[in-house]
Amino acid sequence: MATTIPVPLPQSPYQVQIVPGGLAAIADHLAPLGLGKKIMVVSNPEIYDYYGEVVIQALQRAGYEVFQHLIPAGETHKTLASINELYDVAFQANLERNSTLLSLGGGVIGDMTGFGAATWLRGINFVQVPTSLLAMVDASIGGKTGVNHPQGKNLIGAFYQPRLVYIDPVVLKTLPEREFRAGMAEVIKYGVIWDSELFTALEEAEDLSSIDRLPDELLTKIIQRSCQAKVDVVSQDEKEAGLRAILNYGHTVGHGVESLTGYGVINHGEAVAIGMEAAAKIAHYLGLCDQSLGDRQRQLLLKTKLPTEMPPTLAVENLLASLLHDKKVKAGKVRFILPTAIGQVTISDAVTDEVIKATLG
């Protein structure tokens, strides 16, 4: 059964549409948007092999002129060089202001396609068709786009909202287990920061480590509740002036872990899991939450077979240095999102180097 979640942003409202088994019907959902006839599908080779033809044929049947551009998978290709290649194809296709870039892939493809759409001709249409759990519940919603810089993740980017987020949960059946678990890290995050009922539902599940062991009803609930949580937050704070910062729970340390270990060695969800464990330890050390909160969170992460420990090769001193280049630094202070109860967090810039060394060293 299809579900529609409105994203009521004043300047650029759109919808998140969850349509199980609906990938081949995507053109029907684009029709009301009044897009121009040129659509460029951006994907990676693996995802394209699974779903590219389905999407392209659906668009062509509806009368769109369709182009494609494939970017190799992985964070190591999330660069300005890759964006330049995308621009070259957009130029050759003679994409116009009313043309559309359609992202068919995970978070990396979505971030890059969105940044390309935001910057080509100073902004063209952008549609998200996420194919990973992480992209469905997090990266595809809210308009954050961008690429990595050698010195840090997502340092180059823009806020640019899609015209539509179109989710078919059935495509997750081909997602590798490690990538599924990475997405579950973001789902657990929503339970900690916003939705205690979602957290409890995850605790009651028998196994969260594999999509094959997850009942379809629970998978649909996970996607719907997570998307709704993201929409609730983003619709109140589109450009991270305040509340939206809570979505960075686990990401402060997580981004440091990703960049210091080399993008792709530890994937984004695994790094966020390590970051959430770190945040809970810091919060308990500062007296902001009970030990039981960290215990419950850790049990969920372990049930999902996600890491909770810092990589043994990562020195705390190097982590401290990397944190100062994080996008969340304000007036020279690193902002941490710290849990106070299941479903509640606070934003703090009172986490000193000494606290980090005491809890993570």
Curated annotation (Swiss-Prot):
Main location: cytoplasm
Gene this protein is translated from: aroB
PANTHER family: 3-DEHYDROQUINATE SYNTHASE, 3-DEHYDROQUINATE SYNTHASE, CHLOROPLASTIC
Catalytic function, reaction form: 7-phospho-2-dehydro-3-deoxy-D-arabino-heptonate = 3-dehydroquinate + phosphate
UniProt xrefs under NCBIfam families: aroB (TIGR01357)
Biological process terms in GO annotation: amino acid biosynthetic process; aromatic amino acid family biosynthetic process; chorismate biosynthetic process
EC number: 4.2.3.4
Entry's Gene Ontology molecular function annotations: 3-dehydroquinate synthase activity; metal ion binding; nucleotide binding
Cofactor note: Binds 1 divalent metal cation per subunit. Can use either Co(2+) or Zn(2+).
Protein name: 3-dehydroquinate synthase
Organism: Synechocystis sp. (strain ATCC 27184 / PCC 6803 / Kazusa)
A Pfam family this chain is assigned to: DHQ_synthase
Residues engaged in binding NAD(+): 107-111, 131-132, 144, 153
Taxonomic lineage: Bacteria, Bacillati, Cyanobacteriota, Cyanophyceae, Synechococcales
Presence of the UniProt keyword Lyase in the record: yes
Pathway where it operates: Metabolic intermediate biosynthesis; chorismate biosynthesis; chorismate from D-erythrose 4-phosphate and phosphoenolpyruvate: step 2/7
Places the protein is found: Cytoplasm
Alphabetic keyword roster: Amino-acid biosynthesis, Aromatic amino acid biosynthesis, Cobalt, Cytoplasm, Lyase, Metal-binding, NAD, Nucleotide-binding, Zinc
Function field: Catalyzes the conversion of 3-deoxy-D-arabino-heptulosonate 7-phosphate (DAHP) to dehydroquinate (DHQ).
